[in-house]
A protein has these predicted regions:
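Phosphate-group recognition and catalysis centered on beta-loop-alpha active-site segments
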Residues: 75-83, 149-426
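Extracellular/lumenal mature domains of secreted and surface-exposed proteins
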Residues: 75-178
Length: 426
């Protein structure tokens, strides 16, 4: 990346996740060229007394040519800057999330020392990442020494337990807590548009652990959050998301659940995730629908949110696809589609449904295979489950059918949570 200071460029390579160590020879060469350019520009535009103004600025042009060569080379596939040592580390993480610190493009035997900023110092070799899990939230500065290189990097630790750690509670024999997942970020407040940025705040305020949402992709490749593939039901416009550009989507406003038009726009997946980052978990339903798995995973990785997100997969094939991108993904499937997770380290949810078409999903083999049960308590054809009121009789029946339930998905988290508390399940 080039940053221009006045007319004279200097080169830095800095990204959110990687910090480039500048090559030792380049700054001196750039400084020399900059001085020469300043002198030549001065002579060219302000000629000395007695000097002809038509003098050709040969050395000035040479300086520009040299600089252009450096910049062009820096942008090529054989960029020497890319081959210099650089630090790779996340800038955000959750409590007890494993943070990896790695120096790339350096001799593997180089000694590495990492001061994590909380009193913890670890040493190792460049060949292997140095890992650490923070136990307290806050902003920290990492000080990393690798041979002759020294780099500092800021990292924010959110006050939310990483999913890998949080899911362990469901294996504890005395665990009594049932999590609540809010369907489309719904609560009993119908004035908040579903799957909107404001609905994220509403869901967090309700006390739910997880927000469920759906993803689609526009014709120009922007992943957005919406349940339907069309915008007909949720906005004051009409059209198929996959056939509209993101700019076209932004012409329309979201409607609340009473049908009134609001000031809110359909959010991108990135905006939706950022709105609750570090405060609540997300379940990306069908992971994805019209977006590709790679598109969705890339966004989650970019935001350093792999320990905050479930990838719901409606088939074993989709689960394999997501796990093929990253085996660290918290995949989450319909019951019977869980085979790709068997034998993997970690704990995984599978989903059942209460009273869909008048019936509840049989448990099948998922529980015997070590999966954790989540149950939908949602309106469906053939059932009287309401989106607007909580039927506690239905809740009691659900708990009887699925006594091992770990999480319930609902449109009414603010009503379900007190009902679970009254039953000793929070």
């Amino acid at each position: 990346m080039l940053f221009f200071i006045g007319a004279f460029p200097s080169i830095f390579v800095i990204t959110e996740r990687n910090e480039q160590v500048p090559p030792s020879g380049v700054p001196f060469l750039l400084t020399f060229i900059e001085i020469q350019m300043k002198n030549e520009l001065l002579h060219f535009f302000v000629p000395e007394k007695g000097r002809r103004t038509k003098r050709q600025p040969i050395s000035w042009l040479c300086c520009w040519a040299i600089l252009l060569g450096i910049v062009c080379n820096a942008c090529s596939d054989d960029d020497p800057v890319k081959k210099n040592p650089y630090l790779q580390v996340s800038t955000r993480a959750l409590l007890k999330e494993v943070v990896e610190v790695k120096f790339n493009n350096i001799d593997g035997n180089t000694d590495i020392t990492v001061d994590f900023g909380d009193g913890t110092v670890k040493e190792g070799k460049a060949a292997n990442p140095i890992t650490y899990a923070y136990t307290q939230s806050g902003d920290y500065t990492l000080h990393v020494t690798a041979g002759q290189y020294e780099v500092q990097k800021r990292i924010r630790i959110y006050n939310l337990l990483a999913l890998t750690e949080a899911m362990k509670q469901f294996r504890e024999p005395d665990n009594k807590k049932v999590w609540v997942m809010t369907h489309r970020a719904h609560t009993s407040d119908r004035t908040v548009p579903e799957n909107s940025v404001s609905s994220v705040e509403d869901a967090i305020d309700s006390g739910a652990e997880v927000i469920e949402c759906d993803t689609h992709v526009t014709s120009d490749g922007v992943v957005v959050v919406c349940h339907d593939q069309t915008i007909n039901a949720t906005t004051n416009g009409t059209g198929d998301i996959t056939k509209m550009t993101y700019a076209e989507l932004q012409k329309y406003n979201l409607k609340d659940r009473n049908g009134r038009v609001t000031d809110e726009k359909m959010p991108t997946l990135e905006e939706f995730l950022k709105a609750g980052r570090g405060r609540i978990y997300y379940n990306l339903d069908y992971s994805p629908r019209t977006a590709t798995s790679q598109q969705v995973v890339d966004i989650v990785m970019k935001l350093d949110m792999m320990e905050s997100v479930f990838f719901y997969c409606n088939s074993a094939q989709k689960a394999e696809e997501v796990l093929g991108i990253t085996p660290k993904a918290h995949v989450y499937t319909w019951t019977g589609s869980h085979k790709p997770m068997m034998g993997l380290p970690g704990n995984y949810f599978v989903q059942y449904s209460y009273l869909t078409n008048g019936k509840s999903t049989p448990l099948g083999s998922s529980i015997n295979d070590g999966m954790l049960a989540t149950v939908n308590m949602l309106p469906a054809s053939g059932s009287n489950v309401s989106e607007w009121t909580l039927n506690e009789g239905y809740l009691d029946e659900l708990l009887q059918i699925y006594p091992m339930v770990c999480m319930i998905q609902t449109d009414l988290p603010d009503l379900l949570i007190p009902a679970l508390q009254a039953r000793g399940l929070r």
